[in-house]
């Protein structure tokens, strides 16, 4: 059996009991990480897993290059799939983890398509998203009653963002590291309720509603902005 386990956004206590119990009983645990141009490997998922006192011999990382060229990424997904399928065929219980929720911008989804194509048994354990934790930390509801919510990853144009702010009550912006200039052009012209969060659930967590402070920060990958009218 293959399990997709959501780890939550960073705080190790935010995993579900079901997810943690599966991790403890799994024969193999696969986790994603990032491979940078200097060949450094970093895994946010592993930093969460290390809190659970798991047998380190069960842990297997797969590392994806942090660029828009998908050649290396596709190769890693294929080789990782083949390793997992071998484990599966040998009758092992396999867990594959993802930070946040495994159904939301997760690298696991690319493996899932391969599992389904090969008719492997899979169960997904959902989890807490970063924007849900961000709203909780700032004591601010994402939406109420008939309000509408949209999630935009790596918003490319001011027009796209402006249209979202007209048509939706709450706009969650993810993957913002490279598009702060686009966001600035919009939020500097009109007043919005701005909630910025980075590295949620970790000892490096930072939260702010001051746009002048936000736009001058060095924005990390694990960051997001929530805008409300």
PLM segments and residue spans:
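Class I S-adenosyl-L-methionine
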Residues: 1-12, 17-20, 24-120, 212-215, ...
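A contiguous loop/helix-start segment that scaffolds small-molecule binding in enzyme catalytic cores
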Residues: 2, 165-229
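Solvent-exposed alpha-helices and their adjacent loops that cap or buttress functional pockets
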Residues: 21-22, 88, 141-145, 162-166, ...
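Flexible, glycine/proline-enriched loop segments at strand-loop-helix junctions
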Residues: 34-36, 99, 121, 148, ...
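Short gly/pro/ser/thr-enriched loop/turn and capping motifs at secondary-structure boundaries
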Residues: 36-39, 129-132, 180, 202-204
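A short acidic, often aromatic-flanked loop/helix-cap motif at beta-alpha or helix-coil junctions
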Residues: 65-70, 130, 157-159, 202-205
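Short, surface-exposed amphipathic charged segments that create phosphate/polyanion-binding patches used
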Residues: 73-80, 138-140, 164-168, 208-214
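Class I SAM-dependent methyltransferase SAM-binding "motif I" and its flanking Rossmann-like core
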Residues: 100-164
């Amino acid at each position: 059996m293959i399990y997709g386990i959501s780890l939550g956004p960073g705080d190790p206590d935010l995993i579900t009991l079901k997810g943690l119990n599966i991790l403890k009983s799994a024969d193999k645990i696969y986790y994603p990480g990032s491979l940078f141009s200097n060949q450094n490997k970093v895994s946010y998922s592993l930093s969460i897993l290390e809190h659970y006192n798991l047998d380190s011999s069960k842990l297997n990382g797969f590392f994806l290059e942090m660029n828009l060229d998908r050649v290396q990424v596709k190769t890693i997904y294929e080789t990782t799939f083949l390793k997992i399928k071998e484990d599966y065929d040998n009758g092992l219980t396999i867990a594959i983890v993802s930070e946040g929720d495994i159904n939301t911008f997760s690298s696991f989804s690319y493996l899932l398509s391969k599992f389904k194509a090969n008719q492997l048994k899979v169960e997904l354990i959902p989890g807490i998203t970063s924007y849900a934790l961000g709203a909780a930390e700032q004591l601010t509801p994402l939406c109420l009653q008939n309000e509408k919510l949209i999630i935009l990853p790596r918003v490319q144009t001011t027009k796209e963002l402006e249209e979202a702010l007209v048509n939706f009550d709450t706009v969650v912006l993810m993957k913002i590291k490279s598009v702060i200039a686009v966001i600035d052009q919009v939020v500097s012209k009109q007043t919005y309720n701005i909630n910025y969060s980075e590295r949620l659930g970790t000892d490096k967590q930072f939260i702010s509603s001051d746009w002048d402070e936000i736009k001058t920060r060095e924005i990390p990958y694990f960051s997001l902005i929530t805008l409300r009218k």
